[in-house]
From Swiss-Prot:
A lipid is attached at residue 25 (S-diacylglycerol cysteine). This is Uncharacterized protein pXO2-32/BXB0031/GBAA_pXO2_0031. Its main location: membrane. A lipid is attached at residue 25 (N-palmitoyl cysteine). It holds the Pfam family DUF5512. GO terms for cellular component: plasma membrane. It is found in: Cell membrane. It is a lipid-anchor.
Amino acid sequence: MCKRFKFLLAVSALFISITVVLAGCGGSSVPYKKDDTYKDSKDNFITITAENEWRVKGSQNSEANYKVESTEYKGDSHSVVAISVKEKINGSDPLLVVNDYHYYILSPRENGFSLTPIGTSHPNSAQWKEFQEGFKGANDKEEFLKKEVANVNKQNIFKKTN
């Protein structure tokens, strides 16, 4: 009985050790950190309030809090995020999220990140449906995401200010 107890104790300790090591290996997949502030060319300022929450101050006193959710569409460094309005501060929305969600390819940059729009959660969003089909059919997901970013003219580039 004592040998069995020692064996179970050793196996439990090994399992816990492996879990701790693996949990420590996983880094954040987003190219920003909490409390960082970024600015785009339209003078929108994004403050990262949590890994999945942004506060955006735009022109003409527009300000809102957004929820930023990861999706299953990921490559090595590029990923797709769904952005929704959590709270409009002054009754306005600087990112103009019309439907429940707007989908963007989040790409790391040297001094920040970029957001490339790829559709909305509206049921008739042809752009989002085409993206989903193309992604599912792509063998190299990262290469597909890079091509999508290169093919879209409208891209918001945010540079770190602090």
